[in-house]
UniProtKB/Swiss-Prot annotation:
Pfam families: FSAP_sig_propep
Signal peptide: 1-22
Keywords: Amidation, Amphibian defense peptide, Antibiotic, Antimicrobial, Cleavage on pair of basic residues, Cytolysis, Hemolysis, Secreted, Signal
Modified sites of kind Lysine amide: K65
Tissue note: Expressed by the skin glands.
InterPro entries linked: Frog_antimicrobial_propeptide (IPR004275)
Function statement: Antimicrobial peptide. Active against a variety of Gram-positive bacterial strains. Not active against Gram-negative bacteria and against fungi. Shows hemolytic activity against human erythrocytes.
Propeptide: 23-44
Species of the source: Sylvirana spinulosa
GO CC entries: extracellular region
Name of this protein: Temporin-SN1
Amino acid sequence: MFTTKKSLLLLFFLGTINLSLCQEERNAEEERRDGDDEGGVEVQKRFFPFLLGALGSLLPKIFGK
């Protein structure tokens, strides 16, 4: 009986550690995915003002003739 309890306790302990490691890995993946989305938004924010500035300088030259 004592060895059975010991075995079950060991299995429970190892299962808990395994579950904890899987959850940490999942959280790390979600953070990486979230980080990519934020980077894409920042690139868009930097790109549009540049595009508007370029169009603002080109349009008067094109239609000014």
